[in-house]
Amino acid sequence: MATLSLKPRISRSAEGGAIYWRLSNLYFWFFALLGALLPYWSLYLQGRGFSYLEIASLMATIQITKVVAPSLWGWLGDRTGQRVRLVRLGAVVGAISFLGVFLEPAFFGLMLVMLVFTFFWNAILPLYEVITLRGLGSDKSRYGRVRLWGSVGFIATVAAVGAVLDRVSVAQLPWLVLPVFLGIVVSAFLIPSDQGVVRKEEGAGSLRGILVEPAVIAFFLMNFLLQISHGAYYTFFSIHLEQYGYSKAAIGLLWSLGVLAEIGLFIVMHGLFARFSYRQIALCALALTLLRWVLIAEASDWLWVLLFSQLLHAASYGAMHALSVQYIHGYFGRGHHGQGQALYSGLTFGAGGAIGAWASGFLVEGYGTDLAFWGSAIAIAFALIVTWRWLRPPPGQGSIVQSAD
């Protein structure tokens, strides 16, 4: 009898390990692509001869498609239950569309190429967040440990691409990005297939009823302002550092340090959930984000200050994203989970990120990169007010740990 009871236990353990690595794999490659694009794409565009406003507009397309694509694909995922197939479609078409970059089109042609490949690429993550949380089942506290492999992928690519670009022209960047797209495609086909089509899933209340909740409005507004504040960082941080005399390898290492801090945060996040409320952690993270933008604006010529400001990425992205994913899981339920993740991606990373990129472009064009980061600090100050006044946890859930069970 002992032998018979042991076998299922080992089988479940092995199955859990396999699922963990399959889930982690796509995060690695998805964020590896971000590691190739965010730090260096603006430098590539600058090398192509585009102006600061043109660079801001092109970088904003990465965010613009997040407004539409996640909502459309999230709705399809909730409607059909075929999230894995949709992820695979987005990976394949996104990779094929990226090939248009090699034609070296002018401004509007490149914008069209970027709109197409980011439309399909940006559809992947919100769908995959749902796949991951469902794949983890009742053990959702392991989300941070799965998601941290995305940070590992980001760091690996940032460091590798930065080292290569110190030896070759930045014009070669698309050739360095292409293998990462291939990694996304391969990892998408390693995800276990959908277990049948689910036409309609149970959920608590209507989507409209959830969206009119004051706390939910505050949640989206808080994240919208947070992503506006990141516009200068994602668009001009590398150019800002280059203006202060940092090499491409050093720029890559500074980006990597921020994500390394994010990994550390993901590892300990479950402990923070157990001790503090969502509102407490959000207020602390936003305050540290405000400090980060001020330090970058005023003290980028001091390396130790930059090192410290990059460690604060654990707060400005890591803590806020982990909290937001769990918040949506607690508020939107199973029936609206995909649409909740899509709205989070579209309204915050999409609309907020695009507006932040454009606004920072005008500030950099007229006044320089330092003032753009002061604009980021102002946006965070408003986010702090919103969070302090109106943000509350989902009903009956005093902490994120409870909402994750």
Predicted regions and their residues:
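Interfacial helix-cap and linker-helix signal at transmembrane-aqueous boundaries
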Residues: 45-46, 76-77, 148, 163-168, ...
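Helix-loop junctions at membrane interfaces in 12-TM secondary transporters
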Residues: 102-114, 297-309
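Juxtamembrane intracellular "pre-TM" segments in multi-pass secondary transporters
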Residues: 2-17, 191-225
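Cytoplasmic helix-loop-helix junction between adjacent transmembrane helices
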Residues: 115-149
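Structural signature of the two symmetry-related core transmembrane helices
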Residues: 85-99, 280-295
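Helix-loop boundary and gating motifs at the non-cytosolic
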Residues: 14-63, 216-254, 321
